[in-house]
Each structure stands twice: as structure tokens, then as C-alpha cells.
């Protein structure tokens, strides 16, 4: 599927699924590895008087090229907008055991590759945030070229701020597990803030996702921060896996029409 098709797809879904946005739902399009005949697909759209016989369906046509006129059509089932209560997994271990296992998985994630991850232009569209597991969390300003190169050269060496330092010994007692958000967090103390005269604090919040990365840094109060980090290995624990329903994501299932 080329960029022309993707743009075309976006505008079609933006139009036919506009009613979903009013319910503050996010939609994920899933193209099924199955096919359906045109006759059967049309039957799912309802009778000529407009009565829907099999649910809420639309036919989506995607242009495969810019000018070749080749079009692929799909029968797409729109998600129902009624609210459903997400089911929570049954605990597989005690909270203490869960936190211990999560801590190990987080540590393993950084041992396998590098101990540090960086995110450019994250905080106020100015700062680079560096998370070095077991060492510290820092913020500094750098040029885009330095970020891309991986050298991470601060533009002003005297303005590298330590938001938090890790302790030498990590204990599960330092961590909080949020059953609702399915996250685990740890509070770190950093260097003294010149505005408050107190140490900077940062809550590092880890969650299950498919890419190891810094997602967001928020300054809640002066020199008090929240850092959100995605850790794929946490997804191996059911207590950290979030369903589409919990994420506010509904699937639009599309089957190719032959």
C-alpha cells in the first residue's frame, strides 16, 4: 500500500467514521487475511430500503496507484459505541512478587542493548531527556544533528540538569504498582532546584508497550516531574497488558472483496 492509498484511506475513514469521534473512541483498522464475494458483501449493507440486516458495515475502496485506476474494495465492520466494562486479569502472584519480577524485566531491557535511552524536543519542545537505567535521568538542550548522531553533545554543558538519581540498591518497596493504569513507578531524587531550594523529584512510570522508549516528560510542579517509559518486556506479565477496550481503542475489521 503506497502513500497515495494511505492518504486516501485516511480521508475515507475520517468521513465515514466521524460519528465515532464524538464518543471519544480511537479506531484501529485491521485488514483480515480473508476474502468475501461482492454479492455477499453487498448483502451485509442491508436491503434497498436502508434497513441494516447484519450490523453496521461500510464498503471501503482504496486506490492502489495514483492514476492506474486500480481499486481494491473492503467490507468493513464498524465497532459498536456502547460502553463495556473491561475485564481485569486474575492476579498470578502477590504484589511484592509482581514488583520484583517487573523490576527484573526493566533491568533486563537495558542490559541487552544500552543502559540509556534519549528523547529529543520532548519537554517544552526544547529539552533532550536522557534516561540511564541505574544511573540517572537528565535533561539538556542539544542540536538535532547531535541527537541523530547519537553523540548527544549538550549545547550548553553548564546546563545539564539531573532530574533524578538511582539508588545503589533497588528494593520493591521503592516501587508502586497501579492496578488501574497497569503501571509501576519509582520516585527518584535529583540535584537541588535553584527555584525551590529542594531536590528535584521525578516519578519514573513504566508501562507495557512494543517499543522501548521515553514517551513523555511532564513538569507537574516546579522541579517535580513525571517520566513515562514504555518497556516491551513488561508485556510478558498479564498484570501489565492493556486491552484495546482499556486504551479506548476500537477495532475496525475489514475483509477484502473479490
UniProtKB/Swiss-Prot annotation:
Lineage, highest ranks first: Eukaryota, Fungi, Dikarya, Ascomycota, Saccharomycotina
Subunit structure, as described in the record: Interacts with missfolded ER lumenal proteins.
Protein localization: Endoplasmic reticulum membrane
Keyword Transmembrane attributed: no
Binding-site residues for a mannooligosaccharide derivative, renumbered to this chain: 127, 139, 194, 200, 219, 225
Disulfide partners: 116-132, 193-223, 208-235
Membrane-topology annotation of the record: Peripheral membrane protein
Signal peptide annotation: 1-18
Top-level taxon of the source organism: Eukaryota
Protein keywords: Disulfide bond, Endoplasmic reticulum, Glycoprotein, Lectin, Membrane, Signal
Recorded GO MF terms: carbohydrate binding
GO cellular component: endoplasmic reticulum lumen; endoplasmic reticulum membrane
Family according to the record: Belongs to the OS-9 family.
Name used for this protein in its record: Protein OS-9 homolog
GO biological process: endoplasmic reticulum unfolded protein response; retrograde protein transport, ER to cytosol
InterPro entries: Man6P_isomerase_rcpt-bd_dom_sf (IPR009011), MRH_dom (IPR044865), OS-9-like (IPR045149), OS9-like_dom (IPR012913)
Main location: endoplasmic reticulum
Record function comment: Lectin involved in the quality control of the secretory pathway. As a member of the endoplasmic reticulum-associated degradation lumenal (ERAD-L) surveillance system, targets misfolded endoplasmic reticulum lumenal glycoproteins for degradation.
Gene that produces this protein: YOS9
Glycosylation site list: 2, 51, 70, 165
Organism name: Candida albicans (strain SC5314 / ATCC MYA-2876)
Domain MRH, chain residue ranges per copy: 114-237
Amino acid at each position: 500500500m503506497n502513500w497515495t492509498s494511505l492518504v486516501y484511506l485516511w480521508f475515507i475513514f475520517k468521513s465515514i467514521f466521524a460519528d465515532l469521534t464524538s464518543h471519544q473512541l480511537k479506531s484501529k483498522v485491521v485488514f483480515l487475511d480473508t476474502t468475501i464475494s461482492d454479492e455477499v458483501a453487498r448483502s451485509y449493507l442491508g436491503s434497498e430500503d436502508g434497513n441494516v440486516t447484519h450490523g453496521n458495515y461500510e464498503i471501503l475502496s482504496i486506490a492502489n496507484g495514483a492514476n492506474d485506476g486500480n481499486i481494491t474494495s473492503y467490507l468493513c465492520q464498524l465497532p459498536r459505541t456502547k460502553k463495556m466494562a473491561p475485564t481485569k486479569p486474575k492476579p498470578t502472584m502477590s504484589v511484592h512478587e509482581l514488583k520484583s519480577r517487573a523490576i527484573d524485566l526493566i533491568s533486563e531491557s537495558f542490559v541487552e542493548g544500552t543502559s540509556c535511552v534519549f528523547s529529543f524536543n520532548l519537554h517544552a519542545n526544547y529539552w533532550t531527556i536522557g534516561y540511564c537505567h541505574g544511573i540517572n535521568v537528565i535533561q539538556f538542550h542539544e542540536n538535532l544533528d547531535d541527537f541523530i548522531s547519537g553523540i548527544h553533545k549538550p549545547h550548553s554543558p553548564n546546563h545539564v540538569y539531573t532530574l533524578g538519581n538511582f539508588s545503589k540498591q533497588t528494593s520493591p518497596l521503592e516501587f508502586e504498582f497501579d492496578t488501574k493504569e497497569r503501571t509501576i513507578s519509582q520516585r527518584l531524587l535529583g540535584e537541588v532546584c535553584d527555584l525551590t531550594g529542594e531536590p528535584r523529584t521525578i516519578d519514573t512510570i513504566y508501562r507495557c508497550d512494543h517499543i522501548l522508549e521515553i514517551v513523555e516528560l511532564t513538569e507537574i510542579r516546579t522541579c517535580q516531574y513525571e517520566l513515562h517509559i514504555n518497556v516491551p518486556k513488561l508485556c510478558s506479565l498479564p498484570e501489565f497488558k492493556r486491552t484495546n477496550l482499556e486504551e479506548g481503542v476500537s477495532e475496525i475489521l475489514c475483509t477484502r472483496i473479490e
